Every structure is written in structure tokens, then in C-alpha cells.
């Protein structure tokens, strides 16, 4: 049985363990594997031999710390040194030196790499596992056609087909196919060997014609026939070594290299015993595959399910980094060969250090982290986002699928995903189902398969034994589907339980169960596991919720959720956001930027993150939680980070909510809020924006940073220091200069002032002119300057320009247009902010904070929000925090409702407030209109759910255009806020205006104000004076563009006036 056995109680594994273990696997095994593949390199005359001694390779500790690498925009990497020897064969002398091969970017304990100062993460990819797969499809006549597809390690495919006459063909391209006998002969088998190694020789002999015999008479004839069919070459090609090399490169290397996983799969599927180190496709494989295909034709053996996880493999971080390392070594080999040849040609004495350069390895990894689709910038919106990003699984990327070509069956949930890939958490849109998320307990096995843990059930003993099973193994067992908690193993099991067996879901007796799940969260990803009462929600809304939690903005004053699932602490700790003590000791002092801890007689300074910007412009900040003189233990929390409180994840706020319509202001998911949320900074967040400018050396001279900028008003330069850079702590508004910069340029003779011309004519003095190219604060960027960085790269050439970065902090209260959401997919936009006295209020006089539309619940089927809402109210009144595991209904029916009502009843008794739990309408209460003081007609659900403020904020989206840039070709306004673009009056907008018959407005929108070059210059003036826009004589630019397009197709479009008289004459003549 595949899997590790562990008798201990299961705990949730480290949530970033997948990434970190993958990188450690690359450093332990992948690095040496690729170095051992590096060949011995000889010169053309075979006098000198170069080789690497892998056993003595060294990785040097990084010269800089992670924090400094981020601050100075450097790569956090380690230098790789290997011993190399140069052997002179004539004298048998050897020169050995330790050479520097290049830098390898390191991974930190959170599973991320720092490249050029940016946190990056490598996504795990799901690929079709190499091997052979049999399937059946109906042709156009409705007859089943059986095919066997051999998939190589590189993703290349070779298809075997069997036709109606039981002849077997190998399809080498979309249009060409050749006989299986020709392919086997071209691979080195003769007819006798073929017939001896197959189970059905009579079928092979049945389609062996005289023509076929001639083709496979010799290996050369078979290769020529194969080449002719594969390359679609006419005539009679001649057998040569170059022809064999071309076939080897184009066909055999791409479609016949199985790799170690492919060899294992082929051996298992075809019952072969070929050694594991033989990773290429052999004639034995082809013949065994053909035999099995014949068996399939006659109904022997099962077909393969291509979407089953046993037929998939995970290309992990280790595989991707190892592939890149191998590619870099191939490039290094070419460099060494070229250098040796050059040294001998110029009669120089080479040394190992002179032959090797670090450029191939360093540039390969830089381009991989910068350009590869599976290497992404780490999303650092909040702590949950950082962890979830590293646990993604993607079907996309090199060798994988694309969003356009993937069909529905690939995107759909498969029974083998159970406990391995979350059935809920995926992206929305074109990539739905193609980007998934690992289940909490899943891990990547040795052969690249996803493994999930189960408890093995013993009949006579209560001892628990934990096994990790791959997808190919667990379908042979009866698996009980989460019928008890791991924490409560002593519970008497039910007589009949739901179970899974061979991809079917059954109900069986408990005595028949072999394995059971270890935890209720086992099937879900981290995002879905943070949703309380998830079993009461529709899966589509749970999907939205797990995505929206990743978009929550860290608030200035975070707050724990009253109702949670218990995973909040683990997520916060594994994200690395809180500061945690590495060893026990005593706090000597605490400051805003560091904590000093004494342990074993030494004082250790622990730096804290201070107002650091994430790549989504959110503020990362740590606040000390320990006081001076306090003794702490190892693992204790020293400081809370963004969106964490007491070491628990805290993404939002517990606010008082009523579900009721209010004057139409919460129509269609709009949300009504109280001004208390603004004035008391309940949903206030800090955002840090980065603005940068570079200084180059131009052909006219270097650009200058200065505070003396001509022709600019003084108040725009008020914040600059003597160097021309904005001062720390300055408050800046839109249009202010952040960095003053002048770029030299040559002026035309006509642009000189008269006195400048005189100086040139008499004294020959060249008057220099400069263009102002300052960094200005764009619209919506007002705030406080909190940091200025001047990054100077080594060797300040024109290719390495100096960069000045200015960081500005903004304080954003919640406002109309911001997006808020709960944890059940209930999202909405703030429509109105009401005064406190106008909000509906409870029977104890408290006004509610938010009013949601109750119609958003029934049709969306996310009833979990109502359970959370009521339990949150009870928890706030009783001062309790609830942690609810999912699927609690397995203990008793209506368990969730009983829990909520019992807590409400207890809160009602303890606080002496009968309105908290009224038996006539439990969970609801009579509330009053704040404007009139009268009660509303119907009782209303009130409660305290956990509401998040999302990163989709109105300040980043609102945009207006009065003047701006135009496209060069169409002369129409550009598109998008970043380009100061305009709104497009599209086809449907035109229909709406046509419905009202507003011809003049339509003409203005489509011509004068858009792409009529002359008319748009007169629009502003005529609007100010109240006149009418003069009617232009010529056509708008887009019409002229159409005319030019038609001319390019040799179609001339002319217009001329036809009078009524001429029209009648022409009609009479006709």
C-alpha cells in the first residue's frame, strides 16, 4: 500500500509546506542530478578535457538579508561554486580550481523568492502524466473507434489506432499515419521479433501485404518509409545519417522520451518489467500497446479516464527549477566549448576560471522568474492571500492547457479530487476549473501524485493508523465520508454511513468500511475552510466567498471574528505576518520598529515591519503585543501584523446588521451604512502608493535632479528639498512636484530668445535648453510622504539608470461606491451613508450599522449568513467567540439551528433582553424606524456577521475626462483610467439614445466630441457662451479612415449630389 504510516493524531500541516519542501527537494536532489549530467568537454583535436567535480559543490550563505534585498531591489540568492578540472591529455597534467557558476535565487521559509526586490512565487502545475491511455470514440457512422495515446515526458503524443479490419496504425501527424509494423521496424525490430513479442501474431500477419514486407525488409527501408510519411516528402529520399538525426530530433526526442514517471506508468499499464532507468520508448512498449489495443477492440480490459487524478502528475517547484538549471548548464556547456576552441585558436593557455562564466545560470533564472507563466508576483493583499497563492494548482502554462481549448469535462469536479483538490475554490471567468487549490491535508508524493491522508479502521482494536494514499490506491477501499471528527474518535459510530468506493458514493454498513477521513476540513482549501456554516451555502456562493476573502483590505483597527471555524490562528501563523519568538527569554524593551529580547545572556533585536507597501498598495505593519519585562516562551507571538489580532486572522469587522429593505437604497445588492463606520474609523484602511522616476544619460548630457525648475509655479515646488526631492512627512496634493528633473535638449534656431541669439553671434556661447520632465503626483494620489528611496545600481551607466522612489500613504475611510462582502458570497456596494439617528434601531436603542437586502438570500441559497448573523449577535452579548466545524449535522439533525437558537435564548436570559429571542419568530426582532420612531410592520433578522471591506474601492475606479489623449489612427479618445481615456458610446448606448429620438445628442457624441478634429476644438467655446456648435463641412476622422481602408481594397467611395430633376430623367430613360 502506498503511503506513510503514522500512529499519532493528525495535525494540520504547515500551509506553505508544499512550496518549501519542493525547493528543498531541488537543493538536495535536483541540483546534483543535473550537475552529474554535465558532460566532459574536449577540444576539436582532443588535447584538452574539461570536467566538473560535482561532489564538492558549495552554496554560499547570502551576503544580504531578505529585508535588505527588498529595500534595495536586489535578488536574495546564493552563489554556487563547483570544483572544475582541466586535463592536458598529452602531458597528463590537471589543473583544478573552484569556479563560480552563478547565483541561484533562494526561497524563504514562507515559500517565496525575492527577485529584483519583488516577492515571487512558483505555481504548481497539473499535467497529463506520461504513459499510455486507451479511449473509445464514435466516428461519423456511429461505430466505436479505439485509440491508444502514448504521452511523452515533454507532452508530445503518439496515437495508435485500430480500424474495422483490425489493422493497427500509428498516427504521426494530423493527416499522416503509418503501419505499426513500419514503426517497430524503424525502431530496430525485425519481423520475427515482432511476431514473437505479440499475443496476437495472426492479426499482425493478416495485414502484412507484399508491399508491407518490402517496406520492413530492412531497417533502412523502414526508416525511409517512416521519414517519407512523417515529413510528407515526395520522391525517393536517400538514407543518410543526417536523415536519421532529423528524425531523432523531430520525432523520437519529442514523442518517445517517457521519463521515470512515464516508464513506471507504462510498466504498470502494460504489465512490463522494463528497468526504470530505461526512460525511452522501446519496440516492446509499442508492441505491448498494440496487443492491449486489440484486446480493447474485443472488449477485454477497462478504458482509461483521462481526468482521473491517477492519470495526472504535479510539476512542482522542484521540477521547474531543475529544468531551468539543466537548461542553464546546456548553455554553459556551449560557452565552454566555444571558449576552449577560441583559446586554442589564439594559442592561449586556458584555466577553468577563464572558461566558465556565471552569466548563463544567472540570466536563465532571472528570465524564468521574470517571464515564465507559472512564476507570478506574490499577491500580498492580506495574510490569507499570501498563503493561498502558493497552494494554487494550474492546468495552464507550458505543456498544459489554455483557457480557450479546455473542455467542460476537464474543468469539472472529479471523484478522485476528494481530499486532494478543493471542489469549491477556483477562479471565476474563463479559467474556471483550470486553476484550483490544494486541499488542506494534501501533499505531493514521490511520483508527482497528490496524496491524501486517511485513518485505517481495525475491527478489533481502536488504535488509529494514518495512511497517505495516492489516487490510484484509495479507490480500492471503502472510504467513510467524514463521519466523525478526529478529535472525537471514541464516539459510537452509526450503523449505516455514506462512503466512497470506485468513484461511486454509496451508503453501507459501518463494518464494511476500510478507511475514514481524518478531519471535516479535509476536502476543502484554506479559503473555503474559513467559511462558517459552509454546508448551508450554495457551492457557487462559497466559491465567491473564498475568492473575496483574498481581496479583503487589512483595516487600521482589526477585530477577531465572533463566529469562525478554528483555522484562523493557523493561517495567521503560517503566513509569517505576526512576529513570533524563536526562543524563550525576557523582553528588555519594545519600540515601534523593534523588540529587544534577552535569552542565554545575549540581547537579540527583532526588527518589526514598519509601514511597508504590498504589491496591491495595502499597508503591511507590525504592532508589538508584549510589554517590557515580560518573560516569553518559544513560539509566543511578539507582534501582530496587518489583519491579525492575537495571532488570529482578522480580515473584517463584526458589525450590527439588519436584513430589511430601506427606501430602495439596498436594491440589487446595494448596502446602506451608518455614519458611525466613517467617524469611528471602523472600516478605515491605509494604502501606500509608489511613484518612481529614472534618470538617464542622454545624447545631449545627463538628466539633472534639481529644485530649480523654470516656468513652474512656486507652490508646486514647495515640498522639494535642496536636492530637488520631496521631503519626508510632506503633505502632497494632486499636481505637486515629487521629484524635480530637467532633461537637456537642443533647441531650434527659431526658438531662441533675441538676447540668446546675440550672445551666440558675438561671443559664440551655446545656450543650453532643458525640458522639464518632473515626477508629478497624479489625480487621486494625495497623501503623506512616508519614504523616499534613491536606488543606485552598481556601475551607473546609461543602461543602469538611477531610480528615485517616493512612497505616499493615504488614509481611506469607507465611502459611497466601496465594495463590502460577507463570508458567504453576499457582496454589495455602499449606496448611501445615513446619519446615526436615521438608521433603524433596536429595542435597547442601538442603531444598526448596515442594512442588507433580504431578497439577496433566498435566490442565492447562501443561508449560512443567517446562522452566522444570529450566532454573532448571541456571541457579542455573551462575550463569547464560537469556532464551528463544518457538517455538524452528522451528529444530529438541525444541529446548526439548535446551536444558534440555544445561544440566542441564553443571551436573552443573561442580558434580560427578551427581544433577543422571541419564540413567535426566533432569530427576528421588532425594530424601529430612526426617522419616525415607529416600529416597522414586520419583525426583522438582526445580528452581527463578519463583514469585509474589499480592495475594489471607488477611489481607484472613479474617473472623469474633460480633455486628454486621442488615438493616432482613429482620432478617438483612448480607453482606460490610466490613460485619461473617455467613455465609449457603444452600440447599445446608441440604441438607447435612438429610442428617445435625440438626433443632435447622438451627432455630438459620435462626431463633434469624439473624432472630428476641427469641430471638437470649438465645442468648449460654444458651450461656455451658450451658442450652438457650428456644423462642420468635412467628415469625421473614423469615416475618413473607412474610406482609406476601402481604397486599400481597390474600392473608391465617392459622394455627389443627385437633384430631383436628374433623378426623374434617369428613371424615365430606364
UniProtKB/Swiss-Prot annotation:
Extract the Pfam families matched here: RNA_pol_Rpb2_2 (PF04561), RNA_pol_Rpb2_3 (PF04565), RNA_pol_Rpb2_6 (PF00562), RNA_pol_Rpb2_7 (PF04560)
**Enzyme Commission no:** 2.7.7.6
Identify one Gene Ontology CC term for this UniProt entry: chloroplast
What domain of life is recorded for the organism?
Eukaryota
Q: Where in the cell is it found?
A: Plastid, Chloroplast
Its keywords, alphabetically, are: Chloroplast, DNA-directed RNA polymerase, Nucleotidyltransferase, Plastid, Transcription, Transferase
Q: Which InterPro entries match?
A: DNA-dir_RNA_pol_bsu_ext_1_sf (IPR042107), DNA-dir_RNA_pol_su2 (IPR015712), DNA-dir_RNAP_su2_dom (IPR007120), DNA-dir_RNAP_su2_hyb_sf (IPR037033), RNA_pol_bsu_bac (IPR010243), RNA_pol_bsu_CS (IPR007121), RNA_pol_Rpb2_2 (IPR007642), RNA_pol_Rpb2_2_sf (IPR037034)
Q: Which GO terms describe its biological process?
A: DNA-templated transcription
User: Which NCBIfam families did the record assign?
Assistant: PRK00405.1
Q: Return the similarity comment.
A: Belongs to the RNA polymerase beta chain family.
Function field: DNA-dependent RNA polymerase catalyzes the transcription of DNA into RNA using the four ribonucleoside triphosphates as substrates.
What is this protein's name? Answer: DNA-directed RNA polymerase subunit beta
- Upper lineage ranks? Eukaryota, Viridiplantae, Streptophyta, Embryophyta, Tracheophyta
Report the gene name: rpoB
Amino acid at each position: 500500500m502506498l503511503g506513510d504510516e503514522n500512529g499519532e493524531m493528525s495535525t494540520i500541516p504547515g500551509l506553505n509546506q508544499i512550496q518549501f519542501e519542493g525547493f528543498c527537494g531541488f537543493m538536495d536532489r535536483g541540483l546534483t542530478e543535473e550537475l552529474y549530467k554535465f558532460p566532459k568537454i574536449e577540444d576539436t583535436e582532443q588535447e584538452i578535457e574539461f570536467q566538473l567535480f560535482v561532489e564538492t559543490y558549495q552554496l554560499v550563505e547570502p551576503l544580504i538579508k531578505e529585508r535588505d534585498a527588498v529595500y534595495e531591489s536586489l535578488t536574495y540568492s546564493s552563489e554556487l561554486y563547483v570544483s572544475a578540472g582541466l586535463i592536458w591529455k598529452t602531458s597528463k597534467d590537471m589543473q583544478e580550481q573552484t569556479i563560480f557558476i552563478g547565483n541561484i535565487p533562494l526561497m524563504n521559509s514562507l515559500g517565496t523568492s525575492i527577485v529584483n526586490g519583488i516577492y515571487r512565487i512558483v505555481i504548481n502545475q497539473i499535467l497529463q502524466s506520461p504513459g499510455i491511455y486507451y479511449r473509445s470514440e464514435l466516428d461519423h457512422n456511429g461505430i466505436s473507434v479505439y485509440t491508444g495515446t502514448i504521452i511523452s515526458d515533454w507532452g508530445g503524443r503518439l496515437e495508435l489506432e485500430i480500424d474495422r479490419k483490425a489493422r493497427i496504425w500509428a498516427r504521426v501527424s494530423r493527416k499522416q499515419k503509418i503501419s505499426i509494423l513500419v514503426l517497430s521496424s524503424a525502431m530496430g525490430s525485425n519481423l520475427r521479433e515482432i511476431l514473437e513479442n505479440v499475443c496476437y501474431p495472426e492479426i499482425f500477419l493478416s495485414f502484412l501485404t507484399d508491399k508491407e514486407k518490402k517496406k520492413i525488409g530492412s531497417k533502412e527501408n523502414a526508416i525511409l518509409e517512416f521519414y517519407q510519411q512523417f515529413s510528407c516528402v515526395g520522391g525517393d529520399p536517400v538514407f543518410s545519417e543526417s536523415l536519421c538525426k532529423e528524425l531523432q530530433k523531430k520525432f523520437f526526442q519529442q514523442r518517445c522520451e517517457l521519463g521515470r514517471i512515464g516508464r513506471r506508468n507504462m510498466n504498470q499499464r502494460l504489465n512490463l518489467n522494463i528497468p526504470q532507468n530505461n526512460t525511452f520508448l522501446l519496440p516492446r512498449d509499442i508492441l505491448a500497446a498494440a496487443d492491449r489495443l486489440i484486446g480493447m477492440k474485443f472488449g477485454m480490459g477497462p478504458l482509461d479516464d483521462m481526468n482521473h487524478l491517477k492519470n495526472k502528475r504535479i510539476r512542482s517547484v522542484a521540477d521547474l527549477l531543475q529544468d531551468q538549471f539543466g537548461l542553464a548548464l546546456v548553455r554553459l556547456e556551449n560557452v565552454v566549448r566555444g571558449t576552449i576552441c577560441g583559446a586554442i585558436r589564439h594559442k592561449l593557455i586556458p584555466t577553468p576560471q577563464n572558461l566558465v562564466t556565471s552569466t548563463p545560470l544567472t540570466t536563465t533564472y532571472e528570465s524564468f522568474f521574470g517571464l515564465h507563466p507559472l512564476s507570478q508576483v506574490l499577491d500580498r493583499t492580506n495574510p490569507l492571500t499570501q498563503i493561498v497563492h502558493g497552494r494554487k494548482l494550474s492546468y495552464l502554462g507550458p505543456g498544459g492547457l489554455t483557457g480557450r481549448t479546455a473542455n467542460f469535462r476537464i474543468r469539472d469536479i472529479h471523484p478522485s479530487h476528494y481530499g486532494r483538490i478543493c471542489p469549491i475554490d477556483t477562479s471565476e471567468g474563463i479559467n474556471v476549473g483550470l486553476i484550483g487549490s490544494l486541499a488542506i491535508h494534501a501533499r505531493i508524493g514521490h511520483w508527482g501524485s497528490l496524496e491524501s491522508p486517511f485513518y485505517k479502521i481495525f475491527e478489533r482494536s481502536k488504535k488509529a493508523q494514518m495512511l497517505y494514499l495516492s489516487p490510484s490506491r484509495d479507490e480500492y477501499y471503502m472510504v467513510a465520508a467524514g463521519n466523525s471528527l478526529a478529535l472525537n474518535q471514541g464516539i459510537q459510530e452509526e450503523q449505516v454511513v455514506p462512503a466512497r468506493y470506485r468513484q461511486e458514493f454509496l451508503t453501507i454498513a459501518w463494518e464494511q468500511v476500510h478507511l475514514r477521513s481524518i478531519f471535516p476540513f479535509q476536502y476543502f482549501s484554506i479559503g473555503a475552510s474559513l467559511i462558517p456554516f459552509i454546508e448551508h451555502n450554495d457551492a457557487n456562493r462559497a466559491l465567491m466567498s473564498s475568492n473575496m476573502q483574498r481581496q479583503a483590505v487589512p483595516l487600521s483597527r482589526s477585530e477577531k471574528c465572533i463566529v469562525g471555524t478554528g483555522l484562523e490562528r493557523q493561517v495567521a501563523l503560517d503566513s509569517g505576518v505576526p512576529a513570533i519568538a524563536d526562543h524563550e527569554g525576557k523582553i528588555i524593551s519594545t519600540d515601534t520598529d523593534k523588540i529587544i529580547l534577552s535569552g542565554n545572556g545575549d540581547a537579540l533585536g527583532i526588527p518589526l515591519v514598519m509601514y511597508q507597501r504590498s504589491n496591491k498598495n495595502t499597508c503591511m505593519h507590525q504592532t508589538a503585543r508584549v510589554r517590557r519585562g515580560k518573560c516569553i516562551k518559544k513560539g509566543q507571538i511578539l507582534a501582530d501584523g496587518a489583519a491579525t489580532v492575537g495571532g488570529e486572522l482578522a480580515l473584517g469587522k463584526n458589525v450590527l446588521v439588519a436584513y430589511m429593505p430601506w427606501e430602495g437604497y439596498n436594491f440589487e445588492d446595494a448596502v446602506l451604512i451608518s455614519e458611525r463606520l466613517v467617524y469611528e474609523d471602523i472600516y478605515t484602511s491605509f494604502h501606500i502608493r509608489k511613484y518612481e522616476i529614472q534618470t538617464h544619460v542622454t545624447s545631449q548630457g545627463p538628466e539633472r535632479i534639481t529644485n530649480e525648475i523654470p516656468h513652474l509655479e512656486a507652490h508646486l515646488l514647495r515640498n522639494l528639498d535642496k536636492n530637488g526631492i520631496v521631503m519626508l512627512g510632506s503633505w502632497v496634493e494632486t499636481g505637486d512636484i515629487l521629484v524635480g528633473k530637467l532633461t537637456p535638449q537642443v533647441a531650434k534656431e527659431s526658438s531662441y530668445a533675441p538676447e540668446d541669439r546675440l550672445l551666440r553671434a558675438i561671443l559664440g556661447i551655446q545656450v543650453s535648453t532643458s525640458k522639464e520632465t518632473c515626477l508629478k503626483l497624479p489625480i487621486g494620489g494625495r497623501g503623506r510622504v512616508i519614504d523616499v528611496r534613491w536606488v543606485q545600481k552598481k556601475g551607473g551607466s546609461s543602461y543602469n539608470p538611477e531610480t528615485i522612489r517616493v512612497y505616499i500613504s493615504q488614509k481611506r475611510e469607507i465611502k459611497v461606491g466601496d465594495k463590502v462582502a460577507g463570508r458567504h458570497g453576499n457582496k454589495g456596494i455602499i449606496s448611501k451613508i445615513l446619519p446615526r439617528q436615521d438608521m433603524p434601531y433596536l429595542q435597547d436603542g442601538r442603531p444598526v450599522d448596515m442594512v442588507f437586502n433580504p431578497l439577496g438570500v433566498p435566490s442565492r441559497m447562501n443561508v449560512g449568513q443567517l446562522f452566522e448573523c444570529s450566532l454573532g449577535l448571541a456571541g457579542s452579548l455573551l462575550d463569547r467567540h464560537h469556532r464551528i466545524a463544518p457538517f455538524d449535522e452528522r451528529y444530529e439533525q438541525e444541529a446548526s439551528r439548535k446551536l444558534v437558537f440555544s445561544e440566542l435564548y441564553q443571551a436573552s436570559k443573561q442580558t434580560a433582553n427578551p427581544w433577543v429571542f422571541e419564540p413567535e419568530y426566533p432569530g427576528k426582532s421588532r425594530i424601529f424606524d430612526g426617522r419616525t420612531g415607529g416600529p416597522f410592520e414586520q419583525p426583522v433578522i438582526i445580528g452581527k456577521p463578519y463583514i469585509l471591506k474589499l480592495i475594489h474601492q471607488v477611489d481607484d475606479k472613479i474617473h472623469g475626462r474633460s480633455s486628454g489623449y486621442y488615438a493616432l489612427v482613429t482620432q478617438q479618445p483612448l480607453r482606460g483610467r490610466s490613460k485619461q481615456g473617455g467613455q465609449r458610446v457603444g452600440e447599445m448606448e446608441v440604441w438607447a439614445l435612438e429610442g428617445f429620438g435625440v438626433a443632435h445628442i447622438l451627432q455630438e457624441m459620435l462626431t463633434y466630441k469624439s473624432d472630428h478634429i476641427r469641430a471638437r476644438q470649438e465645442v468648449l467655446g460654444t458651450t461656455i457662451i451658450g451658442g450652438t456648435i457650428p456644423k462642420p463641412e468635412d467628415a469625421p476622422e473614423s469615416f475618413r479612415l473607412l474610406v482609406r481602408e476601402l481604397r486599400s481594397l481597390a474600392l473608391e467611395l465617392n459622394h455627389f449630389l443627385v437633384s430631383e430633376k436628374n433623378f426623374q430623367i434617369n428613371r424615365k430613360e430606364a
